[in-house]
Amino acid sequence: MTVGISAGELRESTEEELITKLRESKEELFNLRFQMATGQLANNRRLRAVRQEIARIYTVMRERELGLAAGPDSEDSK
C-alpha cells in the first residue's frame, strides 16, 4: 500500500498513477475502518495518515484541473 507519499512525489506522477494511488488509498481506508469496527485495528494513527494521503492526491488533481500546477507530461513539451 501507499505509505508516506509526499506532495512533491504526487506532483511528479501522471494522472493515471494518481488515480491508481487514490483507488489504493481508498481501499486501504475501507479496510482500516472495517478493522476498527471489529476491534482488530492495532495502529489507529494509520487511519489519519491514509486520510491525509487521499487529501493530498485530491489536492494535486485539483491543482492540475485549475492550471495551478502542470503535470509531468506538459513539462516535457516546454
UniProtKB/Swiss-Prot annotation:
Keyword Ribonucleoprotein on entry: yes
InterPro entries (UniProt xref): Ribosomal_protein_uL29, Ribosomal_uL29, Ribosomal_uL29_CS, Ribosomal_uL29_sf
Membrane is among the record's keywords: no
GO CC annotations on file: cytosolic large ribosomal subunit
GO biological process, one term: translation
Protein keywords: Ribonucleoprotein, Ribosomal protein
One GO MF term: structural constituent of ribosome
NCBIfam families in the cross-refs: L29
Family: Belongs to the universal ribosomal protein uL29 family.
Protein name: Large ribosomal subunit protein uL29
Species of the source: Mycobacteroides abscessus (strain ATCC 19977 / DSM 44196 / CCUG 20993 / CIP 104536 / JCM 13569 / NCTC 13031 / TMC 1543 / L948) (Mycobacterium abscessus)
